[in-house]
Amino acid sequence: VALSIISCTAATGVACAQGSAKAMPDTREKFEPKRDASKDIQNAIKKATKENKRILLDVGGEWCIWCKRLDEFFETNSDARQYLKEKYVVVKVNFSQENENKEVLSKYPKIPGYPHLFVLDKGGKLLHSQDTGLLETGDHHDHDKVMTFLKKWAG
């Protein structure tokens, strides 16, 4: 319950709230507390090496409306979704009361709010830590800001 109230983006003061972003079919990949994030990252490294892609760690949880809004952004913007698919191997890393993934996340810089994105090279080396609050405009993720971020770090 406490995590439902923590700030999504501490830097911008935007609060997380429970609930869905919009009434649309929920086909997105969810943040799963029971997943083995370390194993998922190792599998992503193998895939990224084989496909010559970067890795995008998407850290968040089902409790965070901005995490759902970021997923919705990719669902509704086919150009961004396609670019992400072509250039990145995406790994959702759960952060919730059920599983904070402390061991995995301790290897990366402190997260100021959720969702948070880490860009890794194909070997798993951290290239960039992205506060997603900087990719927002008002109550949504800004298409141009997200695309600029994706293109800058695609390699």
Please state what every model-predicted region is.
Residues 51-62:
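Short active-site neighborhood of thiol/selenol oxidoreductases, capturing the structured segment around
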Residues 68-83:
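Typically the conserved alpha-helix immediately C-terminal to a functionally engaged Cys/Sec
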Residues 35-53:
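A short beta-strand-turn-helix
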Residues 16-35:
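N-proximal helix/coil linker or "cap" segments that precede and/or mark the start of modular domains
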